[in-house]
Swiss-Prot record:
Binding sites annotated in the UniProt record for Zn(2+): 146, 149, 159, 162
Keyword Translocase: no
Compartments (UniProt record): Cytoplasm
Example GO molecular function: ATP binding
Species for this entry: Salmonella paratyphi A (strain AKU_12601)
Short motif 'KMSKS' region, span: 333-337
Subunit structure: Homodimer.
The gene coding this protein: metG
Function: Is required not only for elongation of protein synthesis but also for the initiation of all mRNA translation through initiator tRNA(fMet) aminoacylation.
Protein name according to UniProt: Methionine--tRNA ligase
A Pfam family annotated for this UniProt entry: tRNA-synt_1g
Sorted UniProt keywords: Aminoacyl-tRNA synthetase, ATP-binding, Cytoplasm, Ligase, Metal-binding, Nucleotide-binding, Protein biosynthesis, RNA-binding, tRNA-binding, Zinc
Cofactor dependence: Zn(2+)
Catalytic activity: tRNA(Met) + L-methionine + ATP = L-methionyl-tRNA(Met) + AMP + diphosphate
Cofactor annotation remark: Binds 1 zinc ion per subunit.
């Protein structure tokens, strides 16, 4: 029977918009999607959302390296991410970005409420500054030794070994990730969220049973060591949202990232023209359920900062956090050199999505355990379970039904008690899906598959088919096999969406959880076609080799004007306004004796003459050709004494140098002396 319908909002952690989706990411998105698909099969109203985490210095710097704007980079990355998730049949209702109007408005709203309620504190801090790059260093651009567990090579905000969070200034022997320089200390005013004010609430939430035991235990350690105020601001230059009424200060990426869950849902509601659901799901007393699927590396942010921010701004807290472990490949950390750092898109060129969905599902539980993708075991398990046990059950029976009975199943079950055994298992399997004990669900289903195949072996329809006068028996046996196959595939539908579609086409019937108690009797099925192909180790070898080649290609240096000459540090409008650019007429141009780089230009500014030395000789071997051209010059540059004379300004040119220098000229109609604005 269908349960009482619940309203459920499910999220996955937001992938960072500076890199491709890999098989480590896919564990979480597959886990969440299987759970969501099960909930939908049971009749619940589920909104499944995600977004790209699109802010922060890493994105700003990578865009500079690529020679594009951050907006262009995150736009391209969003399309790539969405293509990958669609390829794995992740059934999102909405996929958005934290760099959105919805997220900006909600971030400012939450910040304003926290500030009005006294939970935002201002104070001047000493911050690490890269003297070579001329910028304050974000947490992730400082590395050193963890002050808690003394693990080396840890980031400036949290330790990946012990999970501790800290200030970058607490790191032992810090180094700038950008330049390798030893950072120096500089003062800057920052904004802090008063997390300790929420300690009592957070401890009560922890004891409420809303968290996995392992997470609750870890949180207790953090409570015992004492909660600290959380720095939620970053200094320019920074790609993100500027803090209201604080020029040059930006929200730290971890403030607006989880708000991205709300922003994506708001965007979904707006697309639907739904003006009520956002408040219904996020109001403080909401009876909707909210679940975050996340990795164990971001528990601190989701179990402390996020619920405290929501509480302090009068929004509801999550119903639960569903935390998973990491993915290893062949028993070791994913490795680019070994070809086991595998992108989602690369996987789909060599294997189907259902195969990985099945393997991950078979290994997952509700605990925070790491999952090993053993590629040899993967091949064996997919072939043994999906091909030999499940699909083979249909193929062993469908041929007889199609050829001998025109695709029509028997009017009665051959073994009603056996069929009841299969349908009675729905309670145990459903509970396993519900509680995220996915491995248990798969074991239960495969045990039933063994029973079904044993039934067919014992009944031996291939023998019965040769015996005269036993057509009714043959139809009954094969119909029984197909009905058992239907029940198995109904249980597997959350895991294997592509295979399920093919099965539904063959059965001429939807795989519906609530319909399994009624077998298909006297029902016409369609012609059986191959449902799933066996896989082999040659595909694995090709996958690994392709991953190695992608790493080599990615290592090739990025070129282009912005990559070769990155955009300089941001200046203010007042700084720019100091530069006086003027149109100038080149009255004369000549070589400079004793220099193989310079030309001497005589410039007319509309009544005032200037003498300028310019290093453009390599691009203009015939200086006479410049006479009569107009150009643009910096008119208020202090005169510079050179051994050839005094240079009274600078002409504007583009290009990397050598022959590739291009003197800038204004449009026709500009007059000497006019200001360039």
């Amino acid at each position: 029977m269908t349960q009482v319908a619940k309203k459920i909002l499910v999220t996955c952690a937001l992938p960072y918009a500076n890199g491709s989706i890999h098989l480590g990411h896919m564990l979480e998105h597959i886990q969440a999607d299987v759970w969501v698909r099960y909930q939908r099969m049971r009749g619940h109203e589920v909104n499944f959302i995600c977004a790209d985490d699109a802010h922060g210095t890493p994105i700003m710097l990578k865009a500079q390296q690529l020679g594009i704007t951050p907006e262009q980079m995150i736009g391209e990355m969003s399309q790539e991410h969405q293509t990958d998730f669609a390829g794995f049949n992740i059934s999102y209702d909405n996929y958005h970005s934290t760099h959105s109007d919805e997220n900006r408005e909600l971030s400012e709203l939450i910040y304003t409420r926290l500030k009005e309620n006294g939970f935002i504190k201002n104070r001047t801090i000493s911050q690490l500054y890269d003297p070579e790059k001329g910028m304050f260093l974000p947490d992730r651009f400082v590395k050193g030794t963890c002050p808690k567990c003394k693990s080396a090579d840890q980031y400036g905000d949290n330790c990946e070994v012990c999970g501790a969070t800290y200030s970058p200034t607490e790191l032992i022997e810090p180094k700038s990730v950008v330049s390798g320089a030893t950072p120096v200390m500089r003062d800057s005013e920052h904004f802090f969220f008063d997390l300790p004010s929420f300690s009592e609430m957070l401890q009560a939430w922890t004891r409420s049973g809303a968290l996995q035991e392992q997470v609750a235990n870890k949180m207790q350690e953090w409570f015992e060591s004492g909660l600290q105020q959380w720095d939620i601001s970053r200094d320019a230059p920074y790609f993100g949202f500027e803090i209201p009424n604080a020029p040059g200060k930006y929200f730290y990426v971890w403030l607006d990232a989880p708000i991205g869950y709300m922003g994506s849902f708001k965007n979904l509601c707006d697309k639907r023209g739904d003006t009520t659901s956002f408040d219904e799901y996020w109001k403080k007393d909401s009876d909707a359920e909210l679940y975050h699927f996340i990795g164990k590396d971001i528990v601190y942010f989701h179990s402390l900062f996020w619920p405290a921010m929501l509480e302090g701004s009068h929004f509801r807290k999550p119903t639960n956090l569903f935390v998973h472990g990491y993915v290893t490949v062949n028993g070791a950390k994913m490795s680019k050199s070994r070809g086991t750092f595998i992108k989602a898109s690369t996987w789909l060129k060599h294997f189907d999505a259902d195969s990985l969905r099945y393997y991950y599902t078979a290994k997952l539980s509700s605990r925070i355990d790491d999952i090993d993708l053993n590629l040899e075991d993967f091949v064996q398990r997919v072939n043994a379970d999906i091909v030999n046990k499940v699909v083979n059950l249909a193929s062993r029976n469908a041929g007889f039904i199609n050829k001998r009975f025109d695709g029509v199943l028997a009017a009665e079950l051959a073994d009603p008690q056996l069929y009841k055994t299969f349908t009675d298992a729905a309670a145990v399997i459903g509970e396993a899906w519900e509680s995220r004990e996915f491995g248990k669900a798969i074991r239960e289903i495969m045990a039933l598959a063994d029973v079904a195949n044993r039934y067919v072996d014992e009944q031996a329809p291939w023998v019965v088919a040769k015996q005269e006068g036993r057509d009714a028996d043959l139809q009954a046996i094969c119909s029984m096999g197909i009905n058992l196959f239907r029940v198995l595939m109904t249980y597997l539908k959350p895991v294997l969406p592509t295979l399920s579609e093919r099965v539904e086409a063959f059965l001429n019937s939807e795989l519906n959880w609530d319909a399994i108690e009624q077998p298909l009797l006297g029902h016409k099925v369609n012609t059986f076609k191959a449902l799933y192909n066996r896989i082999d180790m040659k595909q694995v070898e090709a996958l690994v080799e392709a991953s190695k080649e992608e790493v080599k290609a990615a290592a090739a240096p990025v070129t282009g004007p912005l990559a070769d000459f990155p955009i300089q540090e941001t200046i203010t409008f007042d700084d720019f306004a100091k530069i006086d650019l003027r149109v100038a007429l080149i009255e004369n141009a000549e070589f400079v004796e004793g220099s193989d780089k310079l030309l001497r230009l005589t410039l007319d500014l509309g009544g005032e003459k200037r003498n300028v030395f310019s290093g453009i000789r390599s691009a203009y071997p015939d200086p006479q050709a410049l006479i009569g051209r107009q150009t643009v010059m910096v008119a208020n540059l202090a005169p510079r004494k050179m051994r050839f004379g005094v240079s009274e300004g600078m002409v504007m040119a583009a290009g990397p140098g050598g022959k590739d220098i291009f003197l800038l000229s204004p449009d026709d109609g500009a007059k000497p002396g006019q200001q360039v604005k």
